[in-house]
């Protein structure tokens, strides 16, 4: 069985911090790169649909890179492939933590989930912007392909999760306070839904019947971030809620709840930054 390593936990929390601590809307001059370190605390279920969750604290690395092509910021790590006035095409990266079935009652006796990586293109479309340039509304259209990490890689199939995104700077009139919100549906192939929610015959029990998930609707997500910088210190928080009602796998015996929530907070000391400044929205 695979357990979540401290390194994997750091990467996951760092990815969320990229979304939390880099939120903005108005064009400003910022360092080309920044890095830092600090404590973070995250609470997350074992997987979407699990009624068991983990809390962990880690020393969290923080990296922001505002390159012309490669960027690590509020949308995660990505390579910008093409851009126009109100839209651009990215190639982005994401992933999932490994989960040990030895610690999850619903999956007892089944193989654990390996750590996985998601990669794929995403089209970002700017829909509107406030007159003061403090609020921007965007539509994000991603398509990702997933695969497990380790010696024997396994395909997880495809997923798309279009979201409506709102970014706001100087939230509640507080200078430097930034917030964001995103919401939208998730759709996945049978292969992806099956990896998380299938119960093969050899693992069926009296209370966990054999099950095969279908392709299609995989839930609705709602996420929010809030952050504030004080000179050399970043303070940030994030939260996410997914509703799994009426999904293609809602009746899987591995789905113990249709409500998925995760969140975290972090305090980051910015240890270094570039002298070079770039214009960033």
Across the structure, where does each feature detected by a protein language model lie?
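Short loop/turn motifs that connect adjacent beta-strands in outer-membrane beta-barrel proteins
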Residues: 27-33, 48-49, 68-87, 128-137, ...
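Short glycine/proline- and aromatic-enriched beta-strand/turn motifs that initiate or cap beta-hairpins
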Residues: 28-69
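Residues that define the transmembrane beta-barrel architecture of outer-membrane proteins
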Residues: 33, 53-59, 85-87, 113-119, ...
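Residues on the lipid-exposed face of transmembrane beta-strands in outer-membrane beta-barrel proteins
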Residues: 39-43, 59-65, 76-81, 119-127, ...
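Sequence/structural signature of outer-membrane beta-barrel proteins
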Residues: 42-48, 98-102, 126-130, 144-151, ...
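Extracellular loop and loop/strand-boundary signature of outer-membrane beta-barrel proteins
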Residues: 45-48, 77, 106-109, 146-153, ...
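Outer-membrane beta-barrel transmembrane domain signature
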Residues: 151-234, 242-245
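Predominantly the C-terminal beta-signal and adjacent terminal strand-loop region
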Residues: 224-281
């Amino acid at each position: 069985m695979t357990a979540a390593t401290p390194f994997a936990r750091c990467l996951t929390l760092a990815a969320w911090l990229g979304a939390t601590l880099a939120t903005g809307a108005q064009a400003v001059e910022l360092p080309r790169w920044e890095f830092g370190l600090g404590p973070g605390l995250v609470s997350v279920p074992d997987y979407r649909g699990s009624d068991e969750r983990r809390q962990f604290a880690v020393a969290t690395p923080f990296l922001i890179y505002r390159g012309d092509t490669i960027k690590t910021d509020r949308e995660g790590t990505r390579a910008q492939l093409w851009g126009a006035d109100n839209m651009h095409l990215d190639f982005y990266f994401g992933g999932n933590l490994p989960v040990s079935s030895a610690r999850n009652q619903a999956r007892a006796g089944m193989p654990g989930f390996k750590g996985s990586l998601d990669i794929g293109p995403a089209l970002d479309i700017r829909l509107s912007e406030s007159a003061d340039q403090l609020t921007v509304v965007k539509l994000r259209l991603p398509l990702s392909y997933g695969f497990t990490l380790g010696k024997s890689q396994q395909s997880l199939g495809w997923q798309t999760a279009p979201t409506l995104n709102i970014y706001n700077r100087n939230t509640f009139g507080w200078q430097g306070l930034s917030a964001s919100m995103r919401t939208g549906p998730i759709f996945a192939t049978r292969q992806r839904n099956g990896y998380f929610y299938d119960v093969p015959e050899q693992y069926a029990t009296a209370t966990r019947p054999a099950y095969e998930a279908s392709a299609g609707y995989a839930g609705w997500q709602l996420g929010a971030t809030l952050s504030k910088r004080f000179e050399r210190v970043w303070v940030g928080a994030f939260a996410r809620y997914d509703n799994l009602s009426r999904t293609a796998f809602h009746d899987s015996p591995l789905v113990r709840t249709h409500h998925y929530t995760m969140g975290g907070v972090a305090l980051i000391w910015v240890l270094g930054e570039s002298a070079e400044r770039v214009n960033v929205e």
